[in-house]
């Protein structure tokens, strides 16, 4: 598979700063944005809207192939908007109902294949910034620029703790840390699309580094790999 337009992939575990960097990078370049982590939630919500049974693999595959979804950059670091069929569903897809439904549809092989093709269809001029966990290894394996962001589990737990505290949630940081360690183990050791850097990816440890410094490193690397007009 060859990409039709330049693609920058940004992979890494939750809490490493992928979402913020991808948003800022897409804004800076004026490129399209793909939040692959939201795709299954969006499909699940579309299925709910269209009364499609979550066990109906054939109907879900058809729905996935024609999924009308956009990811728009906002004016703030965490302001990526998810638009489904013209409706802002940024908040809706984060509900527990959507999360549970997403887990069900993600288990269907034909649906996964259809969503893989749908994600690749986001590649369009002038370019695409793809945020995910297997963007550089599976979805856009021939992308000219691959970034892998990581950070210590402790750092990521602290970031998540701060986010939840700011939203008024009462959480325990030790529990968040345990969940992150468990998810890391699951993601890196799974048989299909394990969470690992592509062989040709630039790996950046964001522990203790401000977002502007990370963005500077990324932009410098992008400039070394491709010509951006």
From Swiss-Prot:
Keywords, alphabetical: ATP-binding, Cytoplasm, Kinase, Nucleotide-binding, Transferase
Keyword hit for ATP-binding: yes
Compartment(s) where it occurs, according to its Swiss-Prot or TrEMBL record: Cytoplasm
Pfam family, one: Cytidylate_kin
A GO MF term: ATP binding
GO biological process: nucleobase-containing small molecule interconversion; pyrimidine nucleotide metabolic process
Binding-site positions, ATP: 12-20
SUPFAM superfamilies: P-loop containing nucleoside triphosphate hydrolases
Highest taxon of source: Bacteria
Catalytic activity: CMP + ATP = CDP + ADP; dCMP + ATP = dCDP + ADP
GO CC list: cytosol
EC number: 2.7.4.25
Family that this chain belongs to: Belongs to the cytidylate kinase family. Type 1 subfamily.
Protein name: Cytidylate kinase
Organism: Shewanella frigidimarina (strain NCIMB 400)
